[in-house]
């Protein structure tokens, strides 16, 4: 059963992405395919728990992605505010994921959709709402995929509420704080690093600088220093191979139908390898990004590849160095406090 689950979940991810891709082809609207495919990331909230849990989790995740995209696109109208908004968003998302025990990928795709929306240059709010509505195709595909895979896995319709689920929000926060007293400090570190990454992305916004923010957030998802190091190496090495593969695929000048099939296969492979080998998963992530960006646009491969690689490199290395510096500073402070001599002065005189 465990081996079956390893295969079914990635297949569901491919199914979710197939819905907006082929609807876009049928109605001849490339925006449904390109933007709608991002809505399919809402399927990644799927867990091996119950049918109702998955539908609720996918719908909640999808709503968060939609709001994040709208917020990011709205921020682009006032671009200097982006670092402050991402700082507040990442801080609250980190804490919420810990307090509510939201499973991975928790907040990552919310931040990614914010960054993608920030790169979307809209003239007014109406245009933002119109384009963000295309995400609904992917969310609908995710709900359908969640239903099908839940039935295929023979998951129960409902599950009994656990003792944790019956706690109030305040009680959940107190419990999380008692189990992870460093939680708020980590949230501050996380949001500060993304504040800096977003400021750099803002400075490089004419060169797809938002990839710096996405890469920094992806690396920080490791949360622990050793995992962050491994994810940095994996993202850079995997990015090199993935970009070469992406260039090869784009140079074939495939019709839209063939691109859709390739994207579905790449998406399935990404989800299959992500929990197994982060480096290998990045072999398939980068071609997906490049192919999605070419749908309905005039981008050339040679222009996209150096921008994508530089964004991945800068964002990954920046995040690793900053978290290392902050981790070192905290340890130095703890060591200094631990070695502080007791005050033996007699104050009774």
Question: How would you describe each model-predicted region?
Answer:
Residues 1-110, 114-283, 290-349:
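Alpha-helical transmembrane segments and their membrane-interface boundaries
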């Amino acid at each position: 059963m465990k081996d079956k689950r390893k295969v079914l979940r990635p297949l569901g991810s491919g199914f979710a992405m197939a819905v907006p891709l082929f609807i876009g082809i049928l109605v001849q609207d490339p925006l449904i395919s390109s933007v709608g495919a991002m809505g399919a990331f809402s399927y990644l909230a799927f867990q091996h728990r119950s049918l109702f849990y998955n539908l609720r989790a996918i719908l909640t995740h999808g709503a968060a992605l939609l709001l994040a995209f709208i917020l990011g696109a709205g921020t682009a109208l006032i671009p200097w505010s982006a670092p402050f908004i991402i700082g507040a968003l990442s801080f609250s998302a980190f804490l919420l994921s810990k307090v509510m025990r939201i499973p991975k990928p928790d907040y990552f795709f919310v931040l990614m959709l914010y960054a993608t929306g920030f790169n979307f240059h809209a003239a007014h709010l109406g245009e933002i709402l119109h384009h963000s509505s295309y995400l609904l195709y992917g969310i609908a595909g995710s709900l359908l995929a969640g239903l099908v895979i839940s039935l295929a896995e023979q998951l129960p319709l409902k599950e009994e509420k656990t003792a944790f689920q019956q706690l109030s929000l305040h009680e959940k926060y107190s419990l999380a704080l008692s189990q992870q007293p460093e939680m708020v400090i980590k949230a501050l570190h996380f949001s500060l690093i993304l504040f800096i990454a977003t400021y750099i992305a803002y400075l490089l916004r004419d060169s797809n600088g938002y990839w710096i923010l996405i890469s920094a957030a992806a690396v920080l998802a490791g949360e622990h220093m050793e995992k962050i190091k491994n994810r940095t190496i994996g993202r850079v090495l995997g990015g090199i191979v993935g970009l070469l593969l992406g260039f090869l695929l784009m140079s074939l000048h495939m019709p839209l139908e063939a691109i859709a099939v390739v994207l579905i296969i790449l998406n399935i492979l990404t989800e299959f390898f992500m929990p197994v080998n982060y480096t290998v998963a990045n072999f398939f992530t980068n071609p997906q990004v490049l192919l999605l960006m070419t749908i309905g646009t005039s981008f050339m491969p040679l222009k996209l590849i150096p921008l994508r690689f530089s964004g991945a490199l800068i964002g990954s290395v920046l995040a690793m160095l900053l978290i290392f510096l902050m981790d070192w500073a905290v340890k130095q402070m703890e060591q200094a406090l631990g070695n502080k001599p007791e005050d033996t002065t007699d104050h009774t005189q």
